[in-house]
């Protein structure tokens, strides 16, 4: 196939899509160029599904190569290793709007690989990767119901910005990524500076309107490439099997969904499934039906039963009204030796959240393609198997845990103090101890309480809520504080975090078309009411940060010295700084601009270290009296150390009012003496006098 190119203007950027020259053995491949950021995005679809495959095996891998930024990776091996947190998050970002656009029965392996091969530090790879994935799938001839477009939206001075650069995002009040088809929004991911629901919804509609340029360009590209439509056909439904299944179940599934407790409801449904399968075992064998298909159709009936029930009765499977939030219980200071902690429980979802405060050196150094930087606010989310009553392997964080942790971090980021105002590295860890829906939002609530318990000066408390939507035709219901079952069986789920003032994070995933702006507006208003209710419940724990840090948290003292004095504080081979830290038991960080941060659990020790540093960096004042130690005896006098690294000469004539024949007769090395500074000459040499101190004392006595 000849090389085909499509170019269009997208905000301030020129975007070019190329296909037909590179990676021609992939099912679909496209080079995406956005200014100097260049990605190769490929899609490969298997010709058939694997035997026994019962789910859609879509894999998305986004990777940033260090050569893209003209850098060699750090570390021993000097090559890219496992996926970074950023790569994992962008992989999930691509997956979320693409997955719902494949038919339910499509079970062929599909792999998308997006590789950043050239990186303009001002143009991130996320939007080009989403565009490339959409184009590659459209070219691959899969039963993909796309293409999709994607846009990043900023907000500044009351105006939306399309695809802002990294520099523009630095002072933007919003960073929102939206993806969708020509008719529908499918995915929203955002971080905001406490904006209103109206501004957030406006950003979504603005981004969806602008992304039509992307969709049109991809459609033109596939036409020019002569892409053949997919020949895949969904397997025919087995009406006899479905009819037999419905008859065997009867009204029991509807009754099971009236059981309000999650585990009891799960057990009731499992018992029905087991009984039905045993009842139909003979017929399944006689008719040659596939047991896997029977299981799948049982799941489909579960889905329909729950949806019909909530649409008809407006009562949910746990008995709540549509907008009711589950009972909330909060505790703070639950772990005595941590620097801050909380226990947040909402229904059957629970999180223990801890805060650890460290110094700037405890920050995480990120070796990124665009350059190395340090992260001083860390948020880690853990989801152990016991939280859902299951056994499982304990290993490193999975993609889901990384994604949920990032969402929770976005939720509280808008209220965090600057590093200048609160010079600590802050690590938040959310341990999910129970889960039945929206553990990420429980992490937001728990982290807000734990931060206040730790005395971190957050601007305001933050709460998060997960919302759901069930829609059939014109009928729809919006659900507040969804359960795990409602998340899986609904048409839209979205999570909103924020303060009483506004939204700090919004994540939205939509599985169907037909979600109008009015529906989203209603859902956001219902979410606001739920968020305010949760904030009210959280106020029973804490309403503002504690005035004092934990007894076990390090106290930080910050002082500023002239950068030229840094070498004096460090000393030869680090001897001075090492001596101070060893003698005072403190940890000392020195920055290039002369900022020194002293950390110690003991406030007295921190003050002692501060005094030592101030001594070292202070200038010697003529006329001032110092207490010093005799460092060296010479024939013509003695050198006395009056400040660390600062020695002055007491000439033999300045030792005493009486005549001194031999310096060693009066002074010995190590003697502590009082001296007065007579002069500091242009070369920095210090003249001292013991005699002047004697004479001053004598004059005072008279």
From Swiss-Prot:
Reaction(s) the record says it catalyses: RNA(n+1) + phosphate = RNA(n) + a ribonucleoside 5'-diphosphate
Location of this chain's protein in the cell: Cytoplasm
Organism classification: Bacteria, Pseudomonadati, Pseudomonadota, Gammaproteobacteria, Lysobacterales
Origin species: Stenotrophomonas maltophilia (strain K279a)
Biological role: Involved in mRNA degradation. Catalyzes the phosphorolysis of single-stranded polyribonucleotides processively in the 3'- to 5'-direction.
GO cellular component: cytosol
S1 motif domain ranges (all copies): 623-691
Subunit comment: Component of the RNA degradosome, which is a multiprotein complex involved in RNA processing and mRNA degradation.
Alphabetized GO MF terms: 3'-5'-RNA exonuclease activity; magnesium ion binding; polyribonucleotide nucleotidyltransferase activity; RNA binding
Positions of the KH domain: 554-613
Protein name: Polyribonucleotide nucleotidyltransferase
């Amino acid at each position: 196939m000849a090389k085909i190119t499509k170019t269009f203007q997208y905000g301030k950027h020129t975007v070019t899509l190329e296909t037909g020259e590179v990676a021609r053995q992939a099912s679909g491949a496209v080079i995406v160029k956005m200014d100097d950021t260049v990605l190769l995005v490929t899609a490969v679809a298997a010709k058939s599904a694997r035997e026994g495959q019962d789910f859609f095996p879509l894999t998305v891998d986004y990777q940033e190569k260090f050569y893209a930024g003209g850098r060699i990776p750090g570390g021993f091996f000097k090559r890219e290793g496992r996926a970074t947190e950023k790569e994992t998050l962008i992989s999930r970002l691509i997956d979320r709007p693409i997955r719902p656009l494949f038919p339910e029965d499509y079970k062929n392996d599909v792999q998308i690989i997006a590789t950043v091969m050239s990186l303009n530090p001002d143009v991130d790879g996320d939007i080009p990767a989403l565009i490339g994935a959409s184009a590659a799938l459209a070219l691959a001839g899969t039963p993909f119901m796309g293409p999709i477009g994607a846009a990043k939206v900023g907000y500044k001075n009351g105006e939306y910005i399309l695809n802002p650069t990294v520099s523009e995002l630095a002072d933007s009040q919003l960073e929102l990524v939206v993806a969708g088809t020509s008719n529908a929004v499918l995915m929203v991911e955002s971080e905001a500076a406490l904006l209103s629901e109206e501004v957030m919804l406006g950003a979504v509609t603005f981004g969806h309107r602008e992304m039509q340029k992307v969709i049109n360009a991809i459609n033109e590209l596939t036409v020019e490439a002569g892409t053949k439509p997919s020949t895949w056909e969904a397997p025919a439904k087995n009406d006899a099997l479905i009819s037999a299944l419905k008859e065997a179940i009867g009204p029991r599934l509807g009754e099971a969904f009236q059981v309000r407790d999650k585990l009891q409801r799960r057990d009731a449904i499992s018992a029905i499934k087991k009984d039905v399968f045993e009842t139909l075992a003979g017929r399944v064998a006689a008719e040659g039906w596939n047991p896997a298909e029977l299981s799948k159709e049982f799941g489909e009936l579960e889905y329909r039963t729950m949806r019909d029930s909530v649409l008809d009765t407006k009562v949910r499977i746990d008995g709540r009204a549509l907008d009711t939030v589950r009972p909330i219980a909060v505790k703070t200071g639950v772990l005595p030796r941590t620097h801050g902690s909380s226990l947040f429980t909402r229904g059957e979802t629970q999180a223990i959240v801890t805060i650890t405060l460290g110094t700037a050196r405890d920050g995480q150094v990120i070796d990124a393609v665009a350059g190395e930087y340090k992260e001083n606010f860390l948020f880690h989310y853990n989801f152990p198997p016991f939280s859902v009553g299951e056994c499982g392997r304990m290993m490193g964080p999975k993609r889901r845990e990384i994604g949920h942790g990032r969402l929770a971090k976005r939720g509280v980021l808008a209220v965090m103090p600057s590093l200048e105002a609160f010079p600590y590295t802050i690590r938040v860890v959310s341990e999910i101890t129970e889960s039945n829906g929206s553990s990420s939002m429980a992490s937001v609530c728990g982290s807000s309480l734990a931060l206040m318990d730790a005395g971190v000066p957050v601007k305001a408390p933050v709460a998060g809520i997960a919302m759901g939507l069930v829609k059939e035709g014109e009928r729809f219901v919006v659900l507040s504080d969804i359960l795990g079952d409602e998340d899986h069986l609904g048409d839209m789920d979205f999570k909103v975090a924020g303060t009483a003032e506004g939204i700090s994070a919004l994540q939205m995933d939509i599985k169907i078309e037909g979600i109008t702006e009015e529906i989203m507006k209603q859902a956001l208003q219902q979410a606001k009411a739920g968020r305010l209710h949760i904030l009210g419940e959280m106020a029973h724990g804490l309403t503002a940060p504690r005035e004092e840090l934990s007894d076990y948290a390090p106290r930080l003292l910050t002082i500023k010295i002239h950068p030229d004095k840094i070498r004096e504080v460090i000393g030869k081979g680090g001897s001075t700084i090492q001596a101070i830290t060893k003698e005072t038991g403190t940890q000392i960080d020195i920055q290039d601009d002369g900022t020194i941060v002293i950390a110690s659990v003991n406030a007295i020790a921190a003050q002692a270290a501060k005094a030592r540093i101030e001594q070292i960096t202070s200038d010697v004042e003529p006329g001032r009296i110092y207490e010093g130690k005799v460092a060296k005896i010479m024939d013509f006098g003695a050198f006395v150390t009056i400040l660390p690294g600062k020695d002055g000469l007491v000439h033999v004539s300045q030792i005493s009012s009486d005549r001194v024949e031999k310096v060693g007769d009066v002074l010995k090395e190590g003697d502590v003496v009082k001296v007065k500074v007579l002069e500091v000459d242009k070369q920095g040499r210090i003249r001292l006098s013991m005699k002047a101190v004697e004479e001053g004392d004598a004059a005072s006595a008279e």
